[in-house]
Amino acid sequence: MAKQGSKEKKGYPELKEVIKATCKIRVGPGKETLTEGNCLWALKTIDFIFEDLKTEPWTITKMYTVWDRLKGLTPEETSKREFASLQATLACIMCSQMGMKPETVQAAKGIISMKEGLQENKEAKGEKVEQLYPNLEKHREVYPIVNLQAGGRSWKAVESVVFQQLQTVAMQHGLVSEDFERQLAYYATTWTSKDILEVLVMMPGNRAQKELIQGKLNEEAERWVRQNPPGPNVLTVDQIMGVGQTNQQASQANMDQARQICLQWVITALRSVRHMSHRPGNPMLVKQKNTESYEDFIARLLEAIDAEPVMDPIKTYLKVTLSYTNASTDCQKQMDRTLGTRVQQATVEEKMQACRDVGSEGFKMQLLAQALRPQGKAGHKGVNQKCYNCGKPGHLARQCRQGIICHHCGKRGHMQKDCRQKKQQGKQQEGATCGAVRAPYVVTEAPPKIEIKVGTRWKKLLVDTGADKTIVTSHDMSGIPKGRIILQGIGGIIEGEKWEQVHLQYKDKMIKGTIVVLATSPVEVLGRDNMRELGIGLIMANLEEKKIPSTRVRLKEGCKGPHIAQWPLTQEKLEGLKEIVDRLEKEGKVGRAPPHWTCNTPIFCIKKKSGKWRMLIDFRELNKQTEDLAEAQLGLPHPGGLQRKKHVTILDIGDAYFTIPLYEPYRQYTCFTMLSPNNLGPCVRYYWKVLPQGWKLSPAVYQFTMQKILRGWIEEHPMIQFGIYMDDIYIGSDLGLEEHRGIVNELASYIAQYGFMLPEDKRQEGYPAKWLGFELHPEKWKFQKHTLPEITEGPITLNKLQKLVGDLVWRQSLIGKSIPNILKLMEGDRALQSERYIESIHVREWEACRQKLKEMEGNYYDEEKDIYGQLDWGNKAIEYIVFQEKGKPLWVNVVHSIKNLSQAQQIIKAAQKLTQEVIIRTGKIPWILLPGREEDWILELQMGNINWMPSFWSCYKGSVRWKKRNVIAEVVPGPTYYTDGGKKNGRGSLGYIASTGEKFRIHEEGTNQQLELRAIEEACKQGPEKMNIVTDSRYAYEFMLRNWDEEVIRNPIQARIMELVHNKEKIGVHWVPGHKGIPQNEEIDRYISEIFLAKEGRGILQKRAEDAGYDLICPQEISIPAGQVKRIAIDLKINLKKDQWAMIGTKSSFANKGVFVQGGIIDSGYQGTIQVVIYNSNNKEVVIPQGRKFAQLILMPLIHEELKPWGETRKTERGEQGFGSTGMYWIENIPLAEEEHNKWHQDAVSLHLEFGIPRTAAEDIVQQCDVCQENKMPSTLRGSNKRGIDHWQVDYTHYEDKIILVWVETNSGLIYAERVKGETGQEFRVQTMKWYAMFAPKSLQSDNGPAFVAESTQLLMKYLGIEHTTGIPWNPQSQALVERTHQTLKNTLEKLIPMFNAFESALAGTLITLNIKRKGGLGTSPMDIFIFNKEQQRIQQQSKSKQEKIRFCYYRTRKRGHPGEWQGPTQVLWGGDGAIVVKDRGTDRYLVIANKDVKFIPPPKEIQKE
């Protein structure tokens, strides 16, 4: 089981190389080595034991300290082995830290022991030195400054090990990383300022970063000088930086403050540069893109460098360095080629001139030409130089004095790639850009300013549809003052003065309006409050400064667009539509369609509650014909996946669809028509220029467009959390309030360049914020609607119930409760107005969800913490909760139970869904908490019941599933029931024998496992509160002992058993192996294996021992007319013993009334339904009521005698036909044969064989049929050809005006016919595929008709593997069989046509007659013969394959590698790639023999043939 690592501990970066070296040390004499996990375990264990040393970095000093402390510890008896492993692992790490390379763990421990001995000698020597020099202090501090006992200090150089340690961290994590800062802060506490700065300079790192660090140190020095004027006790910058001091002077105690200040400056500089490297706009992150010109790259780079708060020399260095290192490969090569060795010192202007043409087509062609130009002599170099800019020879383009010349328009000042004339030419292609939709009025480059008279003064106000209020900076005091007013915008909350009834005039229009006086406003604005009154409108789509990317859309291949006529509309609706369309045309959203655009889509309108009309478009046909686009956004963002942020802003994009232009070539398919009332004039046709509402691709095009527009802006602001779904935008950040609002303002300005606006009235600043149906708070989130409506007992329509359930499902991520009873209520009638009835159980279920929604609150995701998902069994569902801290869920959910899945499988399915949700919303893999025990889940996985487990999982106790655990594997006081079930003598049987003497057995269909469970079920039904059950089925035994939940059992037998078990006090379940001599088990096995008289159904009653027969019950009220016979099927199936037969007789009470039972012999072994034939001999109708005893079943012993020859002298008075009391039963079948013949008109032989009537009687039926006499077949049919299994003949025939394609199988005579449209090759090939799919033929005979000999037909026959031969058309010898079939088919068809409405039905009936009803001499139909042949082929193939698999061999066995004698021959039971399995006759064991010890021989029967 894997375990997920936590992010709280970032590992041991300082020991990365040490651990890598330690992993090469072998544990023992074998090849096994220490692993990284062993090392990490040892280090973390030590951190846990010695918490006071946990924060210190792992130096060799710390390791010796830990080693000394470990030696002083005494582990418990149970932990000694683990403690020894800890010491051994630490010894290996210490050796690797010191650069030693021991081969084994034992060698590492020896090295450390030897080092300890040397250290003890050194300490002893140190004691002698102390005696000689008592003033010398024994130091234990970090070098280089050493305190002496006499009070002085000495300096010692930085240890090389420490220096190497810092170098390693700087190389692996970076010079400005947190790891290097932490290491430096630890070691440098006792360093001199000079040591700190020298070590910093010698560290590996980016030169630009070092320059920035130096710049930050200079800034700190300047700030120190400003804040600390020179004085007697004030440190100077030179003292702090260690300038002009020796290390010995700097080590004195009075310089401690200077060293601390210097270290603080260095750490501050490291942090500042690190912050610069991670924020957007960092010059070192500004790199040239592949498609970006060098000039654009330099512009971005210089802008980023100028924004840096560093000194000018640093900026100059960054410009010179980064303009080369951050350039693209092509530009670097061009600069190397042009500037040579001075490329690093060259100015930015020189580099721009060198790279001016890099990336252009001319540059690429120039490189290609240079590559293909042959090498010339050195003396001619430069003679034919020509300027690419002006075209004159003698100099290059970079040396041209005429400046940049455009090669497209010829003007100076810009390059060809920036030429505006070139960009304006050409038609839009996919991926091209186009401007936002423009009105037919004036187009402005920015929001316009217009002159408005405010009071008595004329002012130029900015027209802004995003502003609610009209704002001016000053006012002449006219109007009515209304006090102070608070305004909220992107810049925050501001306060101004409100004035009403102010005189406003625009051109000739004058109104009384409201204004706000705000002296601090940078611009005066005309807001929406007065724009409408003055008749001023602004089309927001006209304000773009950049072009909106276009998305290509098109129709499906072969489609021509919708051509649906406009349906009539009322005068009222036409007027409403005209008003809407006129406004759309003025705003540039629709245009007049040209006459050759013929597509049309219907439009209509509805009136809203406000009384305004709303235009609707029926785009269904256009949507069908339009190619789909990929789904841009696969789901709704969830607040549980958001991170907690200090500030949030919710924005709404106004007129989102109507701002984005529709792909121009597609616009012709969006035309619609405005009708003219009473046809008084021509109709006006329009088309859409923008994304219309209701068109299926509008959402996708909008999402792709916004993705392209916002991609760059989002990349430039990685510090914010940005989300967008359709026109709703979420922005969250941990920045300061002003900086956060500045970013929002920047976004508004950015998308305004494309024509999009963010209306002020829909902007939400701060918490609580409503977004996509959620309500966001600083520490939590919930749904906007916190409550669900109440439901009460009583009727409710399905429509209303579906809406209620839909509201609940939407809020499941905070409820997490299942509603199985309410969901079950929705089953049944699907009509929306059909009623359901709400009961108390539904109300309780609903109230539980309402209460949960009120109480639950969601939390935000913290990327620093692990995510957990806990699953548990709910009410017929799996409920799970996703959290990072207990009691603070991110979200919850429910997975309803799935049929035919076990409990474990359903929990794993829910775990998969949970994992998928977490990965989608947070990008992390969760830790799954499964209910139950780990060993149970591992067992489920090993048994194959589940095939997936989470990456990280563990178990918890889970909810209690059994209220009462009453099934145990121990003996309980009470009777014992021995149960058994299975297939006995080909019939399912089950039963039990109790220790009380009670017995029970019954026949029943089912599998062995089902019958075993049914036996236990019957025992549980009859058993007392305490009982024992003994079974020989391991399956049933394990089921009874499993910790099942009744709700998850899908097997109905198991569910019934569990229901019975719940009501028992205690049940002991025991298992015994079958057929092992256990008396009671063998007794029940014999008992249910006996063939016993068994019945199924309620149509028979038990009899007394003295009664002759069993009474049969009439199933329903039966009416028998006078003199009529009626067959009555009763509810009874019976299973007779092999030595029994039965007879159905008349009851004496019925015989007295003239009602008799006729016939009714039941043979031995009969298992079918019983039918009673009743004859009413009376002159009036007789009624037998339901439930009346009307016949009796008499059992008789079966007596069997062999028949002997009578003798030639014997004579019979019965006649040649043998008609007698038993032979006359066929008379009853004559009416049935006549009825069948009237349906299908089969011949006499078929009737004779099917109904068992004499041949003469069958011939009489045919002769008396008028239809058959009128349509007699010719008596003689000649002609024949090849016959064989799977060999067919085919030909066309005509019946009246219809063409029929006829196929006939030559062996069986099976016919297949189909009506076709014509005798074409295409039609024949289609029918051939149908014919082949049904019959799988091998060969086919046809004439030379054009449809049969076409090349495509021949290719099809080869493809299908059919051997196709052709003969001569109309030659009886080549097509005899199919020609005869034509006549038979048409003759039968003519008989059946009057009986059917459709010709195809009559043709199908003809095939039934000829293939199924027509019997041959042996009583078989063509269909019987065909099926028999196919089965024989299958059996032969199977037998052949089995024979091929049987092999025989001689073999020998080996003992200690020496081969023994050859044994055999014997049969090979199994053969593999390198060995076989045989059975040794002597030991009766199975042996695996390698192929080298085997000699294969032919089967024994082949040897006999020889």
Swiss-Prot record:
Cofactor(s) of this protein: Mg(2+)
Record-annotated Reverse transcriptase domain positions: 587-776
GO biological process terms, semicolon-separated: DNA integration; DNA recombination; establishment of integrated proviral latency; nucleotide metabolic process; proteolysis; symbiont entry into host cell; viral genome integration into host DNA; viral translational frameshifting
Classification via Pfam families: dUTPase, Gag_p24, Gag_p24_C, Integrase_Zn, RNase_H, rve, RVP, RVT_1
Start and end residues, zinc fingers (Integrase-type): 1228-1269
Binding-site residues for Mg(2+) 2, renumbered to this chain: 980, 1012, 1032, 1085
Boundaries of every Peptidase A2 domain copy: 459-530
Catalytic activity, EC: 3.4.23.-, 2.7.7.49, 2.7.7.7, 3.1.26.4
Listed GO CC annotations: viral capsid
UniProt domain RNase H type-1: residue ranges: 971-1093
Residues in the DNA-binding region annotation: 1447-1499
Every Integrase catalytic domain range: 1270-1430
Binding site for Mg(2+) 3: 1291, 1343, 1379
Similarity remark: Belongs to the retroviral Pol polyprotein family.
PANTHER family per record: ENDOGENOUS RETROVIRUS GROUP K MEMBER POL PROTEIN, RNA-DIRECTED DNA POLYMERASE-RELATED
Name under which the protein is recorded: Gag-Pol polyprotein
Organism whose genome encodes this protein: Maedi visna virus (strain 1514 / clone LV1-1KS2)
